[in-house]
Regions:
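C-terminal catalytic "cap/lid" subdomain
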Residues: 1-144
């Protein structure tokens, strides 16, 4: 896997991003526009719906836990969870940009509404490569 530093370019959804997606190029982006209670998590969930694809979220922990593992040593890893149960956990966190939860509440609602299979992984790119190549990976799966 050859990963290079991206060039940052401002392009609009209608004139640029849709065309890149149609060409099957990988697109990494933050929020596509300002929307209340939405972060780049929400944008990514909406893109997964638009592309009819799974949603893979890389974050600073290895998956979903019952509480913040960076604060609590007793945090329990959750390897699999339903959309409904995940949404309940997400809604316990008060929304704010930069919040410390694996997905924001708007993204959680989107993946539940559209039944998007979602993977929560840490920032180890070898682990991501394992998932993409259908090998054993460390992370959490959210699905029905």
């Amino acid at each position: 896997m050859d990963l290079k530093s991206p060039n940052t370019t401002r392009i609009s959804w209608n004139t640029g991003i849709k065309n890149l997606l149609r060409k099957n190029l990988v697109v990494f982006c933050g929020a596509l526009r300002y929307a209340e209670k939405q972060t780049s998590d929400s944008t990514a969930a909406k893109l997964a719906h638009y592309l009819n694809s799974p949603f893979i979220n890389l974050t600073n922990v290895s998956g979903l836990y019952d509480k913040n593992p960076k604060k609590y040593r007793s945090a329990k890893f959750i390897p699999e969870i339903s959309h409904e149960d995940f949404l309940k956990i997400a809604n316990k966190t008060k929304f704010h940009p930069g919040q410390h939860f694996v997905l924001d509440q708007t993204a959680a609602k989107t993946i539940e509404k559209y039944n998007i299979k979602t993977y929560i992984l840490g920032d180890n790119l070898k682990n991501l490569d394992n998932l993409l190549n259908e090998r054993h990976f460390v992370g959490s799966v959210i699905e029905w």
